Amino acid sequence: MQIEVRKKRVKKYFSFDISCLIITRGLEPHPEFISEAKKHKIWVLRSKLVTTNFISKTTIYLSDKLAPETRLHGVLVDVSGIGILITGESGIGKSETALELIKRGHRLVTDDAVDIKEIDGDLIGTSPKITVGMLEVRGIGIIDVTQLYGLSSVVQKKEIKLVMHFEHWRDDNDYDRLGIDENYMDILGVKVKKLIVPVRPGRNIAVIIEAAAVNYRYSLMSQITPVDVIENRMNTISDL
């Protein structure tokens, strides 16, 4: 290319409103290109990645960094591969339940504060950096879950699939016993299925959460609910 033609095209290129320039494949930009970029105060970045890989990685990175986010009070655990957000008033037993779940082989994401980002319709929960791997248990204090139960007991992030809200048991409350009530919690515009768990002495809440996780997984694989099974059995008996 002739020198005058090249200079003219480079100047025209930089006449547009450009935030920055990224050169991939480790290519070396022409000195005239750099000179014109300095004149217009435009950043020129380089990467050894091929263009398609760079675009893919950059898109994922920006989707995470620019995603809408919020922080909720609660505990996030990974139970049988299902991300469960445990909510409820302070002192009701969220952290103690999480500790029991960890002892049973499940994993902690975060305790007390849950940072949540909405990425492409998914809710991704993580822990604030200062409390990663930490669990606060009343009467004991703060414990390092990683040190006590190993690296596999903590996971960095998890998609929230289910919300389990703890509340004190009330005899005058008609709690759902058939699993037919549909409750949802809105988080950053995404509706997440919500289960109300009444808490009182003697109830093994950790086992209940395990059952809820397995039941949720079952509901994803099957269109037939336990209520449907019971109705089918009743119809079969009535036909005899």
Feature locations, PLM:
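Structural motif
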Residues: 19-22, 42-45, 83-85, 106-107, ...
